[in-house]
């Protein structure tokens, strides 16, 4: 199965916005490289549709997942309770760190599982509860 994706460059630590089409294994390899670096940002979508786009931003064991459903609507996936109530976590969004409250922070492995499920099903609704921004 192929997927369109763009991600942080492990070599330079900056987001490389040029999308590439590849098999899921290549995306998984990039994600694993970024895990070794400790942080990263990945955007994925179907090769046949511009939307929806799912993004995964992570730093260490903490991640945030965004859903861009169309050119004007964006959502955050509700967190899984990995951080204490009222805690904030910083993750890289494109090339800058952004802070998110515990309401939207997930375990990085769980967030990667969400991305993987999205790639397989091309559907965002079954992935969890979304809050519109």
List each model region and its residues:
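Acidic, proline/glycine-rich low-complexity IDRs
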Residues: 1-36, 66-133
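Amphipathic, interaction-prone secondary-structure segments
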Residues: 33-73
